[in-house]
């Protein structure tokens, strides 16, 4: 993902290993406290699989704090694994109303009945959407290079 300069490609192995027959699979991690109210951090509402704590189905994505009063909020990491036929299907849909409101393309898939599966990761990646985010990434890179 172009806006995540510090990304562990090993996480992709976990994502790919979870692809089953669903349309789309994506990643989430626990949101930090300061991310919960940040509209640049997309939150995911998930129904977790009863047999696999790290795997679930996305019910909704939002830039707001959803679900209300949750104990844990899930930060959506904008990396997707697609089935080829699902991607072709997705691009055939017009931009949806929820997609326009939230400015989140994955809502187009949900509004059209596509299934988005979610894989939990412990890794937390910094997406660069603002100058503040860029400063965080620069500091992290600087700290990593100083510790080496």
Model regions and ranges:
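Active-site acidic Asp-centered loop
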Residues: 1-2
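Conserved alpha/beta core of the MobA/IspD/sugar-nucleotide pyrophosphorylase nucleotidyltransferase superfamily
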Residues: 71-148
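Conserved core of the sugar-phosphate nucleotidyltransferase
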Residues: 7-96
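A short, conserved beta-strand element in the Rossmann-like catalytic core
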Residues: 5-6, 125
């Amino acid at each position: 993902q172009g806006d995540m300069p510090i990304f562990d490609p090993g996480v992709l192995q976990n994502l790919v290993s979870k692809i089953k027959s669903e349309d789309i699979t994506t990643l989430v991690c626990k949101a930090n406290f300061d991310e919960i109210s940040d509209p640049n951090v997309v939150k995911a509402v998930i129904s977790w699989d009863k047999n696999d704590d790290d795997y679930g189905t996305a019910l909704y994505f939002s830039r707001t704090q959803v679900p209300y009063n949750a104990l844990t909020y899930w930060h959506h990491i904008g990396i997707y694994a697609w089935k080829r036929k699902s991607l072709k299907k997705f691009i055939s849909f017009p931009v949806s109303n929820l997609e326009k409101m939230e400015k989140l393309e994955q809502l187009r898939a949900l509004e059209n009945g596509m299934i988005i599966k979610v894989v939990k990761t412990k890794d937390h990646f910094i997406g660069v959407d603002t100058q503040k985010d860029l400063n965080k990434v620069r500091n992290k890179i600087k700290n990593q290079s100083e510790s080496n």
